[in-house]
Regions:
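Flavin-dependent oxidoreductase catalytic cores
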Residues: 1-262
């Protein structure tokens, strides 16, 4: 996602499903169906290049308010053609087309991962699915299009996705996604740290957080894999230390780890 008028090519329009910001401000004409179809096809072309170059898997980023996620979000997708609609499964058609293009380009044997989130960088309180039923209908569209693994992004992985259903210690987003689709899932969100990434972008540090809850959830099969961000930026040996049980050697996060390495 690039803010209109910024580099590397300031005069180029910043695409969004309906040419709008999340506040409803018009920033560019709404793309035509042909232009949107070409955007979806571009994911396939890029994925084909990734396979040619020897990558082991492909992940499509459909989270955090970036382009694919904007098509999911009713606040930004006002389209009335095949790339929009009144409900979440209908608005998932762009993602499904990008997934099918990707699958066609990489073949049946290369893993295709799809990352999604409820929250957006434009609105941390946003939610796509308000119930397991809505989430299931949404995920079915993506799963049927060819997703192998779902990467389920939360700001804090330990938070239950639907506490009104299974309580304050209930399944997180990755747990519900695995339950509803039967597909492997990746959890992510402040793994190994006590506070989420928002503070990091404000220059705040974060203490380490015990991994006992994460390990317990893995052991019972709530999710299958774990993605780690800031903790690994702080300590490149994080995974090796965890594997060896050297938890006492894990380091607190310092915001300087986000600085450019000169």
């Amino acid at each position: 996602m690039r803010k209109a008028g910024t580099g590397p090519v300031p005069e180029a329009p910043s695409d969004s499903p309906s040419g709008l910001t999340h506040h409803g401000k018009v920033i560019t004409p709404e793309p035509t169906q042909e232009e949107v179809a070409d955007m979806a096809a571009a994911y396939g072309r890029a994925a084909g290049e990734a396979r040619r170059l020897g990558f082991d898997a492909v992940e499509l980023h459909g989270a955090h308010g970036y382009l694919i996620d904007q098509f999911f979000w009713a606040q930004m997708n006002h389209r009335t053609d095949r790339f929009g609609g009144p409900d979440l499964p209908a608005r998932a058609s762009f993602a499904a087309e990008a997934i099918r293009a990707t699958r066609a380009a990489i073949g049946p044997d290369l893993p295709l991962i799809f990352r999604f989130s409820q929250w957006k960088q434009q609105d941390y309180s946003a939610r796509l699915a308000h119930s397991p039923q809505e989430l299931e209908a949404f995920l079915a569209v993506l799963s049927d299009a060819g997703v192998d693994v779902f990467h389920c992004s939360q700001r804090r992985f330990w938070e239950p996705e639907f506490p009104e259903i299974d309580g304050e210690h209930g399944l997180n987003l990755a747990g519900w996604t695995k339950k509803l689709t039967g597909k492997p899932t990746i959890t992510v969100g402040s793994v190994g740290l006590a506070s989420d990434f928002i503070g990091a972008f404000r220059g705040e540090a974060s203490r380490t957080r015990p991994l006992s809850d994460l390990i317990a959830r893995l052991d019972k099969g709530e999710f299958d894999m774990v993605a780690v961000g800031r903790a690994l930026l702080q300590d490149p040996d994080w995974a090796a230390k965890v594997k060896a049980g050297r938890m006492d050697e894990l380091r607190d996060y310092d915001a300087a780890s986000l600085a450019v390495l000169n």
